[in-house]
Amino acid sequence: MSTFNRIHLVVLDSVGIGAAPDANNFSNAGVPDGASDTLGHISKTVGLNVPNMAKIGLGNIPRDTPLKTVPAENHPTGYVTKLEEVSLGKDTMTGHWEIMGLNITEPFDTFWNGFPEEIISKIEKFSGRKVIREANKPYSGTAVIDDFGPRQMETGELIIYTSADPVLQIAAHEDVIPLDELYRICEYARSITLERPALLGRIIARPYVGKPRNFTRTANRHDYALSPFAPTVLNKLADAGVSTYAVGKINDIFNGSGITNDMGHNKSNSHGVDTLIKTMGLSAFTKGFSFTNLVDFDALYGHRRNAHGYRDCLHEFDERLPEIIAAMKVDDLLLITADHGNDPTYAGTDHTREYVPLLAYSPSFTGNGVLPVGHYADISATIADNFGVDTAMIGESFLDKLI
């Protein structure tokens, strides 16, 4: 059995690898998710060239149909498989929480027709600002500011919208509604959405800048999540004195629970990789766990159904992967996975219920291969097993298979 001093987990947000067994219980624009396949459809429709992930074994992951442009390796450098989600949801928070060892048996509340008047009126009363009612529905984050940003600049009204996820999002032009005011309003919205019938996973502050027809969302986004309902492996590690480092929106997703070092938000995937590499180089980081989320795949290309952009984003990450590997120590373990799918060729604009890939690499490996198909929480079980903390949670460790 290998024991690693450091484990680095990188979540490629929404990079699914084929419909999950229960995918037809989920849908997009009325179309069941049963034919979704993020990586497969990208590879088939626009081509996919990711030689560095392929070298680890991406093309060796078991599939009914091999990835068209990602060949299997005869001698991969790592271990690979695909993982199934058991929780009742396909959103970011559910996926990440399950990866860290929780099973979400009751999904969060979603509002396909917008938020009820009771919630909107409370926010208006608290903020002293009106809410643009026409925006109160599932909306693309970029489209909603294109459509209502000019009006907000004139009136100072709030743009409140949702998505297929259990989220309430408030968009505000930074020159009209200052950040501290936006954050204060979001904190209030969080306080009134903590229980059913409005149990939301996240409240998201969505600041933006610019002029009409040229608005840009800024890096001052802030997520107000729920704390996990039970201890995750992050808490187990922190309680045992094992350092945990969060890169990107990980700290927000877990509401800071179990995070000992928040390395900040990412401005882009590339910036997130820079931050991860910087984190790996910290002199104090001799033992512990880093957890990185790279969200551009999902936020910029999956929801917008932009297969070419999604492919290019995967290419960009793959080009940076050797830098991550170069920053590893011999007793490090790198795990690359995803939290759900978001097939850019599929119906609708929502996430897709898919298996996610798992790639495992360490400079210390003497073997390679395909691991049994598992579940998201196998990752948390493996991390717990490696650091010798309580594993009384869902998931099965694959640590003893990494040689």
UniProtKB/Swiss-Prot annotation:
InterPro entries: Alkaline_phosphatase_core_sf, DeoB, Metalloenzyme, Phosphopentomutase_DeoB_cap_sf. Mn(2+) 2 binds at residues 298, 303, 351. GO terms for molecular function: magnesium ion binding; manganese ion binding; phosphopentomutase activity. The gene is deoB. Binds 2 manganese ions. It comes from Streptococcus mutans serotype c (strain ATCC 700610 / UA159). This is Phosphopentomutase. Isomerase that catalyzes the conversion of deoxy-ribose 1-phosphate (dRib-1-P) and ribose 1-phosphate (Rib-1-P) to deoxy-ribose 5-phosphate (dRib-5-P) and ribose 5-phosphate (Rib-5-P), respectively. One of its GO terms (cellular component) is cytosol.
